[in-house]
């Protein structure tokens, strides 16, 4: 049966509870993998009327998405549910392929999964549900949780202005995917069910085997869909980003070599620089205007501050004064303490914030997401646009 939160204090706060499942239609986003497959099966077992929805994202036959479509269709046939396919290739091309390309051309290291979640996956699912009318909720196989902010057991010692629904980390910290969901809206959260939020990965496999799902033994995907489609991120870059030769310089100004495009480098990179130096050097920054890759010693990668743009406050109202947060600046990194300071713009809207780390951080990478937490609650997040020295 579908689990709610293991923390009994929060059990009645789950967005699953108190929603009458009788005659409630739910659309499950199916990728063809075990996580989304199990989500659909568990919801059915728990009494929901389920249909599957697969987004057709990639152009060309034989792509990862084509394989996913086949697996998702087979799963729906096994479960005896309707399988819907939504052609989202145009919007995916515009919002993910194009913007990822532009990011690399600008000297950033983009985060395609975040782009897809923000502008494609959840928006397309929401539009589908609203258009069909008989559907009420959407579900995915993400390892994260949604609860109601009215829960009396929520700790709000900082007096945040909580919105109606809160996004929480998944119970399995090793699989937690909330980092990629920071851009979701309250409209999405109000309809979103995450059946795997309280499961560990090993439990997912066991449940899939128990239910006899065809995807139960399917290998877990370790790559972005772009990587699976093109073979590697390098091949994607070669296919989409124009090459422009430039210099590799030490931050002291000495020219050490040349490169064939800043898109081939990312902050903190050590391998593949093709330069000689008495000690290891790392990519310290990328200057798009001058087309220069700057390298430095490891200690020079440490940064004290970063500017975060396009901030979305998913669980709280935008703060008007500085707040203390736990910031996660890479998917697999541990959150670090910091202070977030609002920066006013010309239109007096606060979409940019200065993040001041308690301890200097290495490899602060423009284009990646900085996501802000308070304990298990994801407050919001945005994109790293620039950083300052120690």
UniProtKB/Swiss-Prot annotation:
Annotated positions binding ATP:
29-36, 55, 141
> What is the uppermost EC class here?
transferase
Sorted UniProt keywords = ATP-binding, Cytoplasm, Disulfide bond, Nucleotide-binding, RNA-binding, Transferase, tRNA processing, tRNA-binding
Which SUPFAM superfamilies does this entry report, sorted A to Z?
Answer: Adenine nucleotide alpha hydrolases-like
Give the positions the UniProt entry annotates as the active site: 116 (nucleophile), 225 (cysteine persulfide intermediate)
The Gene Ontology biological process terms listed for this entry are:
tRNA wobble position uridine thiolation
Query: Pfam families attached here?
Result: tRNA_Me_trans (PF03054), tRNA_Me_trans_C (PF20258), tRNA_Me_trans_M (PF20259)
What is the reaction catalyzed?
Answer: S-sulfanyl-L-cysteinyl-[protein] + uridine(34) in tRNA + AH2 + ATP = 2-thiouridine(34) in tRNA + L-cysteinyl-[protein] + A + AMP + diphosphate + H(+)
Transmembrane parts of this sequence: none
Q: Where is this site: Interaction with tRNA?
A: 142, 368
Chief place where the protein resides: cytoplasm
What's its EC?
A: 2.8.1.13
Among InterPro entries, the record links this protein to: MnmA-like, MnmA-like_C, MnmA-like_central, MnmA-like_central_sf, Rossmann-like_a/b/a_fold
- Location of region: Interaction with tRNA: 175-177, 330-331
Q: Which GO terms describe its cellular component?
A: cytoplasm
UniProt xrefs under Gene3D superfamilies? Adenine nucleotide alpha hydrolases-like domains (2.30.30.280), HUPs (3.40.50.620), Translation factors (2.40.30.10)
Q: Name one GO molecular function term.
A: ATP binding
Origin: domain of life: Bacteria
Q: Which cysteine residues pair off into disulfide bonds?
A: 116-225
Where is the protein found, in the record's own terms?
Answer: Cytoplasm
Q: What does this protein do?
A: Catalyzes the 2-thiolation of uridine at the wobble position (U34) of tRNA, leading to the formation of s(2)U34.
Q: Which family does it belong to?
A: Belongs to the MnmA/TRMU family.
Q: Which HAMAP family match?
A: tRNA_thiouridyl_MnmA
Q: What is this protein called?
A: tRNA-specific 2-thiouridylase MnmA
Its lineage reads: Bacteria, Bacillati, Cyanobacteriota, Cyanophyceae, Synechococcales
